[in-house]
């Protein structure tokens, strides 16, 4: 029994039983709407691993094992899907020396999907997170971000512009409807039946 307890103590103190994972957490935000129902889909080495459905707070919390390639997809019906790529390959000696990497926080903003705008930029990851030996930490691939950030910004600006135009058209349509409705009420009050019908 004593030998068993000693063995158990050795195992518990071993670096191999330390929780070896990278924590990823954050929030999904949607302007003028709730993130409730957003799906956070996790694929590991090309295979679906997990899926979280968010509540109205939009918070997510993930734990990714080391030595794997992940894609985190943020999806909501009617909205543009965004993908983050995370590679958790870390040299074994680095994990033994420092297994507790600080959590990585992500803030994901989703925009409504629109027609007649090329959204293909979002078929690829909006960011890539990898381990950097010189920092002994995880950081985003700056060269990759520099290559796509302008196109992402231009596409999102085009989406927002179309949404603003659509909202303005809806407001104008509502104004015209209200105007015709009021004319109909006025004609109805004067018992000008045909004029009222034409307005409605």
PLM segments and residue spans:
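A short, solvent-exposed loop/turn motif at the edges and junctions
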Residues: 47, 73-89
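Surface-exposed, low-complexity/disordered segments
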Residues: 92-171
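Short, ordered, surface-exposed loop/turn motifs in non-cytosolic proteins
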Residues: 31-45, 133, 193-196
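Bacterial Sec-dependent N-terminal signal peptides
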Residues: 1-27
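Short, acidic Ser/Thr/Gly-rich low-complexity loop/linker segments typical of extracellular
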Residues: 47-59
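Short Pro-Gly-centered beta-turn/loop motif in secreted/extracellular proteins
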Residues: 61-71, 77
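Structural motif
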Residues: 20-38, 188
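Alpha-helical tetratricopeptide repeat
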Residues: 23, 170-188
């Amino acid at each position: 029994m004593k030998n068993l307890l000693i063995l158990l103590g050795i195992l518990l103190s071993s670096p191999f039983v330390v929780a070896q994972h990278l924590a990823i957490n954050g929030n999904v935000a949607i302007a003028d709407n709730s993130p409730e129902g957003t799906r956070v889909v996790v694929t590991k080495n090309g295979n679906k691993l997990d899926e979280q459905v968010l509540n109205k707070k939009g918070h997510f919390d993930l734990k990714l094992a080391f030595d794997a390639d992940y894609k985190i997809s943020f999806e909501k019906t009617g909205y543009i899907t965004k993908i983050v790529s995370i590679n958790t390959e870390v040299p074994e000696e680095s994990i033994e020396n420092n297994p507790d990497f600080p959590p990585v926080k992500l803030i994901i903003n989703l925009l409504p999907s629109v027609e007649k705008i090329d959204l293909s930029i979002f078929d690829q990851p909006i960011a890539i997170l990898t381990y950097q030996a010189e920092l002994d930490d995880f950081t985003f691939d700056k060269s990759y971000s520099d290559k796509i950030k302008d196109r992402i910004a231009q596409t999102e600006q085009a989406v927002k512009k179309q949404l603003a135009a659509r909202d303005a058209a809806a407001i104008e349509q509502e104004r015209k409807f209200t105007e015709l409705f009021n004319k109909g009420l006025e004609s109805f009050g004067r018992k000008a039946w045909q004029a009222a019908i034409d307005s409605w």
